[in-house]
């Protein structure tokens, strides 16, 4: 082995012996409340810091002062880099389905395989070419190591293609040079330049193909940036790209080893030290070993990268390649066109999960089941108010709501823009507040509860959640609401009127002493008072046991509500209104109205404060039903 440096293990050992492998200037002592954290028994002394492994500093950096302004060129590597990481690699049917998805999303560069290493990949590439499945505006990418027989086989796979990128690579990192290849820097560089020369020589065998080249110094993050530039410039010198016919220099974070800011420094260094920079597309190939792949990519684009390779929803070796869906939608939330069709993320997820045979996390950015879900009460309340405020602002501006600026607390993106719905935004559990319950009733049943009624009903919902120890779904909330406020008939439907989302529910017991059968309202003789006559069904306090009796009552007051309160006093019920709110539930000739009344039932020490709810096509009748609801609740035997 040619030796051009001390053993990588010697360097690491020295680093680990000093300051736990980190000789960077120490930060000020941490501030804390209470007792300090205790030293762990974790073997941190066996690890060397990245700065000890790859000494590098770049004070000339300019990327921190820049902002994202446009989407990079995207390249999907799902069909090769992603596929090789699967327990069960894709068969031809799954590969073709994935290919069709990528094309439909607007990818213009798609890595289709490693034809010299896999007969399956070779056959798939031949199928795409021979069946003319490659659109004219899509360029396929084929991968090969810097080995002669593999490169020759790669060109065989491309016969008949219109345009292709030949991507050749070799590992150049300190660790790989010493441990895997046992070659010095010059020998490693020669592997790359020999491969580049062979690719150029084989162009005569690829006549008719518009050929481009991509070179990757694999394990770039484990390589001295100065040496990476040296190798890349040597390859550029062989390929001789032009601005009209550029080549790609791809920087793989084959293993994520450091923080995104350091990676960005390295990328900017390479970008500013490459030869013929105007003839080079600088590309990234980030992995996610330390969970920072997306952040590292975005900072590296600021640092000069033009192109990004990754996989849909983050598939790939170990912890995966960077997620192109997350990146694209991050750009979208900044008002930048991602230049990919991400309007149906559920369908993208469905296809990716089918082809990869791997389920994604419930909390995967943008695509997971819970990403637009709020269980927290304060979050729910803020989302509800944010959606309402946005609608009001759009109406005031005379703007289309779908295109109006999106500013809603806790929701960085409009779920509708990516094929999601609002239905699952609010979820209720024992930790939720009244906002979630109120949102679901308003969204799914058109009931906009007053604040104090929300507080009252929330106690009922929370008691149910605490008892069941489960999520409280919309159906549970609606059943609880009916059972508490809307007298239920033998049919299991409410007696309050037609309600959005109401269904038969045999689990509910009929309740409600009084039921309004008919009401007539007229003016008194002098026109100053309202005369009301009502027919009610009195089912007794023990509904189902007592014999129902129809009763009539009449009353006079300065309006229908006052007259009705006067009428029911004939039943021995003294009631007064403390608060009254009503709203329409829909528009049109069959529109319904909802009324909410806060009543004092009884007098003096026996008085109860009770809310009632009524629904009817008549606003007046809905108010009277709400009063009956309050009375029924005050007399209900549980």
Swiss-Prot record:
Gene Ontology MF term list: 2-isopropylmalate synthase activity; acetyl-CoA C-acetyltransferase activity; magnesium ion binding
Residues annotated as domain Pyruvate carboxyltransferase: 72-346
CDD domains attached to this UniProt entry: DRE_TIM_LeuA
Key words, A-Z: Amino-acid biosynthesis, Branched-chain amino acid biosynthesis, Cytoplasm, Leucine biosynthesis, Magnesium, Metal-binding, Transferase
Catalytic activity line of the entry: 3-methyl-2-oxobutanoate + acetyl-CoA + H2O = (2S)-2-isopropylmalate + CoA + H(+)
Positions of region (Regulatory domain): 488-638
Keyword Transcription regulation: no
Recorded metabolic or biological pathway in which this protein acts: Amino-acid biosynthesis; L-leucine biosynthesis; L-leucine from 3-methyl-2-oxobutanoate: step 1/4
EC number, as in UniProt: 2.3.3.13
Chain residues that bind Mg(2+): 81, 285, 287, 321
InterPro entries in the record: 2-isopropylmalate_synth_dimer, AIPM/Hcit_synth_CS, Aldolase_TIM, IPM_Synthase, LeuA-like_post-cat, LeuA_allosteric_dom_sf, LeuA_N_DRE-TIM, PYR_CT
SUPFAM superfamilies: 2-isopropylmalate synthase LeuA, allosteric (dimerisation) domain (SSF110921), Aldolase (SSF51569), post-HMGL domain-like (SSF89000)
Plastid recorded as keyword: no
Single GO BP term: L-leucine biosynthetic process
PROSITE patterns, A to Z: AIPM_HOMOCIT_SYNTH_1 (PS00815), AIPM_HOMOCIT_SYNTH_2 (PS00816), PYR_CT (PS50991)
SMART domains per the UniProt record, alphabetical: LeuA_dimer (SM00917)
An annotated GO cellular component: cytoplasm
HAMAP family: LeuA_type2
Family: Belongs to the alpha-IPM synthase/homocitrate synthase family. LeuA type 2 subfamily.
Function recorded in the entry: Catalyzes the condensation of the acetyl group of acetyl-CoA with 3-methyl-2-oxobutanoate (2-ketoisovalerate) to form 3-carboxy-3-hydroxy-4-methylpentanoate (2-isopropylmalate).
Stated name of the protein: 2-isopropylmalate synthase
Organism listed in the record: Bifidobacterium longum subsp. infantis (strain ATCC 15697 / DSM 20088 / JCM 1222 / NCTC 11817 / S12)
């Amino acid at each position: 082995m040619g030796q051009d440096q001390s053993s990588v293990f010697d360097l690491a050992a020295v680093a680990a012996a000093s300051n736990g492998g980190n000789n960077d200037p120490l930060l000020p002592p941490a501030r804390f409340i209470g007792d300090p954290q205790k030293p762990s028994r974790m073997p941190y002394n066996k690890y060397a810091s990245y700065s000890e492994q790859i000494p590098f500093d770049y004070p000339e950096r300019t990327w921190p002062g820049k902002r994202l302004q446009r989407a990079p060129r995207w390249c999907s590597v799902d069909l090769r880099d992603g596929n090789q990481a699967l327990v069960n690699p894709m068969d031809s049917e799954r590969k073709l389905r994935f290919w069709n998805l990528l094309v439909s999303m607007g990818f213009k560069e798609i890595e289709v395989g490693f034809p010299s290493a896999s007969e399956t990949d070779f056959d798939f590439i031949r199928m795409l070419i021979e069946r003319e499945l490659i659109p004219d505006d899509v360029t396929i990418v084929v991968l090969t190591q810097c080995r002669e027989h593999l490169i020759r086989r790669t060109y065989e796979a491309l016969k008949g293609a219109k345009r292709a990128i030949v991507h050749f690579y070799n590992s150049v990192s300190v660790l790989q040079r010493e441990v895997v290849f046992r070659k010095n820097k010059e020998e490693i560089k020669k592997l790359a330049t020999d491969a580049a020369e062979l690719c150029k020589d084989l162009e005569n065998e690829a006549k008719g193909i518009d050929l481009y080249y991509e070179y990757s110094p694999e394990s770039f993050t484990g390589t001295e940036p100065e040496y990476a530039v040296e190798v890349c410039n040597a390859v550029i010198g062989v390929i001789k790209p032009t601005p009209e016919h550029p080549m790609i220099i791809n920087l793989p974070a084959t293993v994520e080893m450091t923080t995104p800011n350091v990676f960005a420094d390295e990328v900017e260094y390479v970008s500013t030290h490459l030869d013929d920079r105007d003839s080079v597309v600088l590309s990234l190939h980030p992995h996610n070993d330390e969970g920072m792949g997306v952040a590292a990519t975005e900072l590296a684009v600021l640092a000069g990268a033009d192109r990004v390779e990754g996989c849909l929803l983050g598939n790939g070796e170990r912890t995966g390649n960077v997620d192109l869906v997350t990146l694209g939608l991050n750009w979208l939330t900044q008002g930048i066109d991602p230049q990919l069709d991400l309007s149906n993320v559920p369908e993208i997820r469905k296809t990716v999960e089918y082809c990869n045979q791997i389920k994604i996390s419930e909390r995967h950015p943008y695509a997971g089941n819970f990403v637009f879900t709020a269980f927290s009460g304060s979050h729910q309340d803020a989302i509800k108010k944010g959606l309402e405020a946005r609608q009001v602002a759009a109406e005031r501006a005379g703007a289309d709501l779908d295109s109006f600026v999106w500013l809603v607390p806790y929701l960085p993106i409009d779920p509708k823009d990516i094929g999601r719905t609002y239905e699952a935004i609010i979820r209720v559990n024992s930790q939720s507040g009244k906002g979630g319950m109120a949102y679901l009733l308003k969204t799914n049943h058109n009931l906009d509860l007053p604040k104090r009624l929300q507080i009252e009903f929330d106690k009922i919902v929370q008691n149910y959640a605490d008892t069941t120890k489960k999520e409280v779904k919309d159906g549970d909330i609606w059943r609880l609401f009916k059972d508490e406020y809307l007298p239920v008939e033998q049919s299991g439907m409410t007696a309050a009127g037609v309600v959005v989302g109401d269904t038969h529910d045999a689990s509910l017991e009929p309740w409600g002493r009084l039921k309004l059968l008919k009401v007539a309202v007229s003016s008194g003789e002098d026109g100053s008072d309202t005369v009301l006559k009502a027919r009610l069904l009195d089912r007794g306090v023990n509904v189902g046991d007592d014999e129902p009796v129809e009763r009539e009552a009449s009353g006079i007051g300065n309006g229908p509500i006052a007259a009705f309160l006067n009428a029911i006093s004939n039943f021995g019920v003294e009631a007064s209104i403390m608060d009254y709110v009503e709203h329409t539930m829909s528009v049109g000739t069959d529109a319904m109205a909802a009324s909410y009344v806060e009543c004092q039932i009884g007098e003096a020490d026996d008085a109860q404060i009770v809310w009632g709810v009524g629904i009817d096509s008549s606003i007046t009748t809905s108010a009277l039903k709400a009063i009956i609801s309050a009375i029924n609740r005050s007399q209900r035997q549980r």
